[in-house]
């Protein structure tokens, strides 16, 4: 009779602690993914700034937006359409959260062609190019 009672107590304790552990893991992963999204945006925007200020060029930036167990980077969007009001901005979204906005400094206009460069979960190669005129062009090439 004592063994089934111990098993029952153990099951209750596990049942009470699992949601707390899961919530903590989810919060930790969301925070880590937010840092990774900001670092990714910073890497792309820094290259765009260097190319824009130097008068032109092309460079590829590798990005890793793989997700975790409880959260993932849903979207990174950089720039806007040509001459769009958000051309010097970037935004990202982690699953279960609202979009976070960032502004490049110095402000450099960037475009993904018809609008913002949009990158979802996974590993990608982003080509950053500028021909000396207009905004810096961003494209996913791999």
Task: Give each language-model segment a name.
Residues 69-142:
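Intrinsically disordered, low-complexity regions enriched in Pro/Ser/Thr/Gly and acidic residues
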Residues 1-24:
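N-terminal single-pass transmembrane signal-anchor helix
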Residues 51-72:
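Short, glycine/small-hydrophobic-rich surface segments
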Residues 40-55:
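N-terminal alpha-helical signal peptides/signal-anchor transmembrane segments
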Residues 30-43:
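Alpha-helical transmembrane signal-anchor/signal-peptide segments
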């Amino acid at each position: 009779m004592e063994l089934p009672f111990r098993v029952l107590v153990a099951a209750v304790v596990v049942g009470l602690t699992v949601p707390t552990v899961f919530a903590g893991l989810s919060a930790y992963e969301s925070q880590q993914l937010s840092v990774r999204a900001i670092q990714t945006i910073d890497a792309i925007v820094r290259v765009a700034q260097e190319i824009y200020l130097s008068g032109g060029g092309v460079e590829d930036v590798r990005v890793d937006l793989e997700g975790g167990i409880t959260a993932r980077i849903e979207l990174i969007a950089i720039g806007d359409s040509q001459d769009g009001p958000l051309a010097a901005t970037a935004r990202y979204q982690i699953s279960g959260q609202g979009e976070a906005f960032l502004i490049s400094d110095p402000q450099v206009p960037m475009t993904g062609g018809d609008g913002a460069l949009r990158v979802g979960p996974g590993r990608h190669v982003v080509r950053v190019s500028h021909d000396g005129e207009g905004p810096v062009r961003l494209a996913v090439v791999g």
